[in-house]
Amino acid sequence: MPDNRRSQTITQGAQRTPNRAMLRAVGFGDGDFDKPIVGVANGFSTITPCNMGLDTLAKCAEHALKTAGAMPQMFGTITVSDGISMGTEGMKYSLVSREVIADSIETCVQAESMDGVIAIGGCDKNMPGAMIALARLNVPSIFVYGGTIKPGHYQGRDLTIVSAFEAVGQHTAHKIDDHELLEVERHACPGAGSCGGMYTANTMSSAIEAMGMSLPYSSTMAAEDEEKRISAIRSAEVLVDAVKKQILPRSLITRKSIENAVSVVMAVGGSTNAVLHLLAIAHAAEVEFSIDDFEAIRARVPVLCDLKPSGRYVATDLHKAGGIPQVMKMLLVHDLLHGDCLTISGQTIAEVLKDIPEQPRADQDVIQPWDNPVYEQGHLAILKGNLSSEGAVAKISGIKNPSITGPARVFDSEETCMAAILERKIQPGDVVVIRYEGPQGGPGMREMLSPTSALIGEGLGDSVGLITDGRFSGGTYGMVVGHVAPEAFAGGTIALVQEGDSITIDAHRRLLQLNVPEAELERRRAAWHPPAPRYTRGVLAKYAKLVSTASRGAVTD
């Protein structure tokens, strides 16, 4: 079969004279119509520092594709900035953007009969959005991550964007003054790149590398470093070879490779959002994978990396310490990684890792030795109980108290909760409930970084629990439980919680329980009525009608 097996439908034969005429206008010459057409899906944007360097990478890839004998076609896809929209109505569009990104890439590639795809992304939803599209399309594809931001510095300490969120709570609690708050703001984000800790963007780029859909080491490179541009060039070269060999995404995105991705997410201390996104990617690839599979993997994989938000280091430190390949090699040696999984280069995982040392270097402490991990088991626990019969996700790293039973403080939106926190109305021992923020009810399943950061800034991070049918940022830590399913809007038990009810969060027992007699719950359930939709027109209304439960990845198809 020719390398242009898909695009020949628009480039070959007398009937396609008009098609070729238009292609000539965008740069095709007589000798180009037999070449494979490779789409470059570019998430470039000046909306966010995460994506402002992507155009440079896209141009590098474009040039490399031409040199390798392919015809690149550049097209854009959207991004939203989770960090800038955080704590506002705009955050409702964040998870929605994952679907828009996936749909736009799928639409463009299918409409133009492209033979391959390079997807370039930076901010949180770019990665899963692209991967969902590539899994649906199943044409030769590779992902290029825009790279991580370097840490900011102030008064001898490293800063990330989460430092700024936590500074708000510190300021409210009069722990810092106006001047220091402004200085944190000025220094937290020094340039281009995705948020620097093992937050959602770096978590998902690491997961994609673990699945073999991006090049080794590419997930932890700094956005502004030359090696990131070299990686984009190399990715284009590898993709052209994959087009020739017909290495397809669904040969790479398998149950085994998703298990590898989950193992790596656990080992690096990654974001709770990985649960939602990997479920959605599995769904797009038609791979059977459930929320319970995360718990099974968590129980056997240790946390090896001491990374923010609960640890000390950022992604660039992990890169210097050996990157994701070093973490993967340690997992492989201890039979916690499937070495026979294929990668986009045509090599297996075991072949890619062949020359990586079995132990991390002794001159660094970002990656801990196997016999002295940060935590002996994974940090993303699936909690069940009468509050979450379908499951909920807790990040149990960095918490001093693995269980809490306390009175419910109930809020039907993030805004009302945030106001109560800033007015110092939340007390130690409380369990905060933020509901009607789920995929359907929000709609859009907003991230609750502002409330959790404010609690931490006020010194309540270890003494207050928080549960929500919304999500958490990758920057969140503490006694927090998200993705509670069924959600309140769908009549889940979280909708029945009343102010002052006793709630138990127990990470060790993996329990999320409303301590109210079943008869009383049934009485409340009979009296409950779903609220009217918050939106009746536009993209949020469409999304609310289509989206699934969080326990299935909040998918829309």
From Swiss-Prot:
Cofactor(s) needed by this chain: [2Fe-2S] cluster; Mg(2+)
Entries under InterPro entries matching the protein: DHAD_IlvD/Edd (IPR050165), Dihydro-acid_dehy_C (IPR042096), DihydroxyA_deHydtase (IPR004404), DiOHA_6PGluconate_deHydtase_CS (IPR020558), ILV_EDD_C (IPR056740), ILV_EDD_N (IPR000581), IlvD/EDD_N (IPR037237)
Keyword Transferase listed: no
Gene3D superfamilies the UniProt entry points to: IlvD/EDD C-terminal domain-like (3.50.30.80)
Binding site for Mg(2+): D82, D124, K125, E447
Cofactor note: Binds 1 [2Fe-2S] cluster per subunit. This cluster acts as a Lewis acid cofactor.
EC number from the UniProt entry: 4.2.1.9
The family this protein is said to belong to: Belongs to the IlvD/Edd family.
Name the record gives this protein: Dihydroxy-acid dehydratase
